[in-house]
């Protein structure tokens, strides 16, 4: 089965920066990787930002456009079916910043995808400078991403003070509690890069 890794986070959180490092790591380990860039816009800017990763061990596919969730899910499902036939070891999905993780899991459970793919790593990239106030919809997405992640990456932590980093972690905890998520946010699941001097 092909392992699918998911990298979630709001627009500007640092998903593409992490994706570049992660894809380079996987290809250095000998994996044949396909990056699936998923964006609601007509032009997929993130796909342009990772073009230099293309090579013998790394390919890029995109899903762009689509005015509603159903259209987007159908396009993702169709793209995953075609990718399953091409012999990748790993697929790394970077969805748009407005993405419901549960909908992605539903797509992976559909036939025939459930026979070809297995869920691998789920990363939630959260900006250490996360605003204190978000819309109710953004709070829900933040909680959904944090609840589903095996690892939470606090990005741009080198630009944040210790108080701002702690505030972002507290915000995550509040978002999970507001959604009545029983998951306890363990600090061991949050990776905070050390500030650079």
Regions found by a protein language model. Name each.
Residues 190-196:
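Conserved small/polar residues in nucleotide/adenosyl-binding loops
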Residues 99, 104-117, 126-179:
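Conserved C-terminal guanine-recognition region of P-loop GTPase G domains, centered on the G4
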Residues 2-8, 13, 17-135:
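Nucleotide-state-sensitive switch-loop elements of NTP-binding domains
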Residues 180-188:
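Short mixed-charge
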């Amino acid at each position: 089965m092909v392992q699918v890794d998911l990298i979630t986070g709001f627009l500007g959180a640092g998903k593409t920066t992490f994706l570049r490092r992660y894809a380079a790591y996987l290809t250095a380990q000998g994996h044949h990787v396909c990056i699936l860039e998923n964006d609601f816009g007509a032009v997929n800017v993130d796909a342009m930002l990772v073009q230099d990763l293309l090579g013998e061990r790394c390919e890029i596919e995109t899903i762009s456009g689509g005015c509603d969730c159903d259209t987007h899910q159908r396009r993702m499902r169709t793209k995953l079916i075609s990718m399953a036939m091409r012999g990748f070891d790993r697929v790394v999905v970077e969805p748009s910043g407005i993405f419901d993780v549960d909908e992605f899991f539903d797509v992976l459970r559909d036939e025939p995808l459930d026979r070809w793919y297995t869920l691998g790593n789920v990363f939630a990239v959260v900006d250490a400078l996360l605003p204190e106030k978000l819309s109710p919809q953004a709070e829900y997405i933040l909680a959904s991403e944090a609840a589903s992640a095996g690892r939470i990456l606090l990005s741009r932590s080198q630009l944040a003070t210790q108080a701002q980093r702690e505030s972002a972690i507290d915000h995550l905890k509040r978002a999970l509690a507001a959604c009545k998520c029983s998951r306890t946010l363990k600090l061991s699941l949050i990776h905070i890069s050390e500030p650079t001097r």
